[in-house]
Amino acid sequence: MAYADNEYRCFVGGLAWATDEQSIERCFNEFGEVFDSKIIIDRETGRSKGFRFVTFKDEDSMRTAIDRMNGQELDGRNITAQARGSGTRGGMVGGYGSGGYRGRRDQGGYNRGGGGGYGGGYGGDRREGGYGDGGYGGQGRSEGGSWRN
């Protein structure tokens, strides 16, 4: 598939491991021409991580797909569709993943997508425990959750 000069890419998450490229293209082509659909594979297991990026020819097609598909069921799972890079107030979604720093927790920017790894989170601030749910800090640590305490 050819790539668009401007990329109109959206993140599609919550996918079943069995969801293949044909299912995605069949579903998303309804809203406009799909240039590319990139599935993210776990290096250790060789299985889908349950999300992919879909690139459209134009912005209107991408926006329509996001509006219509976000929260809909595909292959037995409710999926998430959002513009690539649209995160909460703290910043963008990191890399090819649902994680990454998204600002302070108390401002709604904390990412609960897990800690570390490819696309994993490291959000929050040190007062809140920082480094994501699956990483350093949090409950049971020294008061304040800082690595310095």
Curated annotation (Swiss-Prot):
<feature type="region of interest" description="Disordered">
    <location>
        <begin position="80"/>
        <end position="149"/>
    </location>
</feature>
<comment type="function">
    <text>Possibly has a role in RNA transcription or processing during stress.</text>
</comment>
<feature type="compositionally biased region" description="Gly residues">
    <location>
        <begin position="87"/>
        <end position="101"/>
    </location>
</feature>
<feature type="compositionally biased region" description="Gly residues">
    <location>
        <begin position="110"/>
        <end position="123"/>
    </location>
</feature>
<dbReference type="Pfam" id="PF00076">
    <property type="entry name" value="RRM_1"/>
</dbReference>
<dbReference type="InterPro" id="IPR012677">
    <property type="entry name" value="Nucleotide-bd_a/b_plait_sf"/>
</dbReference>
<feature type="compositionally biased region" description="Gly residues">
    <location>
        <begin position="131"/>
        <end position="143"/>
    </location>
</feature>
<dbReference type="GO" id="GO:0009409">
    <property type="term" value="P:response to cold"/>
</dbReference>
<keyword id="KW-0694">RNA-binding</keyword>
<dbReference type="GO" id="GO:0003729">
    <property type="term" value="F:mRNA binding"/>
</dbReference>
<dbReference type="InterPro" id="IPR035979">
    <property type="entry name" value="RBD_domain_sf"/>
</dbReference>
<dbReference type="InterPro" id="IPR051106">
    <property type="entry name" value="RNA-bind/splicing_reg"/>
</dbReference>
<feature type="domain" description="RRM">
    <location>
        <begin position="8"/>
        <end position="83"/>
    </location>
</feature>
<dbReference type="GO" id="GO:1990428">
    <property type="term" value="P:miRNA transport"/>
</dbReference>
<protein>
    <recommendedName>
        <fullName>Probable glycine-rich RNA-binding protein 1</fullName>
    </recommendedName>
</protein>
<dbReference type="InterPro" id="IPR000504">
    <property type="entry name" value="RRM_dom"/>
</dbReference>
<comment type="similarity">
    <text>Belongs to the GR-RBP family.</text>
</comment>
